[in-house]
């Protein structure tokens, strides 16, 4: 047990302790609950009522959530469909990724507020009597016996609690506490030349995710439910501090110049640094995804750029891939690193592929300089008309198309879906 001279009191034993109530953690929790496992979720935030940026669901993620019985309920809470994405340079369309050409019913990019998705997942988890949810609870230690992870330590002193589990799943994001406590090395890889400054504006809806190149730094823009547009203004990697030192008026003017279509709205609605948030963009990967009794999934195991809207989809796919491995491990009472490595063996190649595609997209769409400006229009026209581009578009949209929700592992007589 790490970090606690006076061990807290033991809590109940559970089959799986999931740390992190994001898309990866809650999807896995529901999958395991539907398969008859006891699941304890530990989430440091007290509620889902907080700001989220990533909310674009690709068709592959939509299909998996639908198979789990979650998509319809989350959509009913409010969402916005986009027909595809477009790269626009000074009013001219260079690339048009038309998702309507993909087979239905998931032939769109779905802007679904993460709060809506997580709320629906959490409600369905709470319908299961084997589910325990510890919100507002921080993990600050692992229970270890002979090098095997046996649970987590939450809090400390008189208010502390030990959650013992057959397997601990770290799904607590890019700065994962579980990963650090487990001593798993993480390689941060500086593959991208841009960071992203996000802001949300009230503006009319559009049907396309767009990348604007209008003379300033490129801007990502998409409609967000109910009546907002999310703007992601790109700026040189690690360059925000120097920019911010020139004052908010300067930052706002740079954003206005980069996206003339929203210039007046930016002027009216962005008033201070509180209205923007910086995303440090980098790639990263844990060197191991597992230890005896412990598994990492989602951003805890691999980190991606926001370009291409892959993060949520990869997280959901990780959960779907981990589900049958954990079910079999619990049945065999084998949750060793060797056994759990089956998850990384399946998912790591896919996540590395996603990173390579994101690097390609970043260089094509976001790079600056005279050479890039001269080459981009011709290169975009040539690339977008090749069969290889259509293949890449399908890979972006679906990811690993062999992944399926293993509903054959679900128990009969489950709680009714809502």
UniProtKB/Swiss-Prot annotation:
Pfam families: FAD_binding_3. It comes from the Bacteria. Involved in the biosynthesis of the tetracycline antibiotic, oxytetracycline. Belongs to the PheA/TfdB FAD monooxygenase family. InterPro entries: FAD-bd, FAD/NAD-bd_sf, PheA/TfdB_FAD_monoxygenase. FAD binds at residues 15-44, 289-299. It catalyses: 6-methylpretetramide + NADPH + O2 + 2 H(+) = 4-hydroxy-6-methylpretetramide + NADP(+) + H2O. This is 6-methylpretetramide 4-monooxygenase. It is an enzyme of class 1 (oxidoreductase). Its cofactor is FAD. Disruption phenotype: Cells lacking this gene produce oxytetracycline with a yield of only 50% compared to the wild-type.
């Amino acid at each position: 047990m790490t970090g606690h001279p006076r061990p807290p009191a033991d809590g109940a034993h559970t089959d799986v302790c999931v740390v992190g109530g994001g898309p990866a953690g809650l999807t896995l929790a529901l999958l395991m609950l539907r398969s008859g496992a006891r699941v304890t979720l530990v989430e440091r935030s007290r509620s889902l009522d907080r700001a989220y940026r990533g909310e674009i669901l690709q068709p592959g993620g939509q299909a998996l959530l639908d198979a789990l019985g979650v998509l319809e309920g989350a959509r009913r809470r409010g969402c916005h469909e986009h027909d595809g994405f477009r790269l626009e340079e000074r009013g001219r369309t260079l690339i048009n990724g038309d998702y309507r050409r993909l087979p239905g019913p998931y032939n769109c990019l779905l802007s679904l507020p993460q709060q809506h998705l997580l709320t629906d997942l959490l409600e369905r988890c709470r319908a299961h009597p084997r589910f325990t949810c510890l919100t507002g609870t921080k993990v600050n230690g692992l229970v270890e016996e002979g090098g095997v992870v046996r649970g987590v330590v939450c809090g400390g002193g008189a208010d502390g609690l030990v959650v013992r589990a057959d397997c601990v799943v770290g799904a607590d994001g890019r700065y994962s506490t579980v990963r650090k406590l487990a001593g798993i090395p993480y390689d941060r890889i500086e593959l991208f030349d841009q960071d992203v400054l996000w802001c949300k504006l009230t503006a009319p809806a559009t049907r396309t995710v767009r990348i604007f190149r209008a003379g300033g730094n490129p801007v990502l823009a998409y409609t967000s439910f109910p009546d907002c547009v999310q703007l992601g203004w790109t700026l040189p990697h690690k360059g925000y501090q120097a920019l911010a030192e020139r004052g908010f008026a300067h930052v706002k003017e740079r954003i206005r110049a980069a996206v003339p279509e929203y210039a007046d709205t930016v002027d009216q609605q962005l008033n201070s640094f509180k209205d923007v948030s910086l995303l440090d963009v980098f790639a990263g990967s844990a060197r191991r995804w597992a230890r005896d009794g412990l598994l990492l999934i989602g951003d805890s195991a691999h980190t991606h750029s926001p370009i291409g809207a892959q993060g949520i989809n990869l997280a959901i796919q990780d959960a779907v891939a981990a589900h049958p491995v954990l079910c079999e491990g619990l049945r065999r009472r084998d949750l060793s690193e060797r056994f759990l490595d089956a998850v990384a063996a399946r998912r790591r190649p896919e996540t590395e592929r996603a990173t390579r595609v994101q690097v390609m997209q970043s260089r094509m769409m976001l790079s600056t300089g005279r050479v890039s400006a001269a080459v981009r229009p011709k290169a975009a026209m040539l690339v977008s008309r090749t069969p290889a581009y259509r293949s890449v578009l399908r890979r972006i949209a679906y990811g690993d198309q062999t992944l399926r929700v293993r509903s054959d592992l679900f128990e009969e007589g489950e709680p009714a879906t809502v």
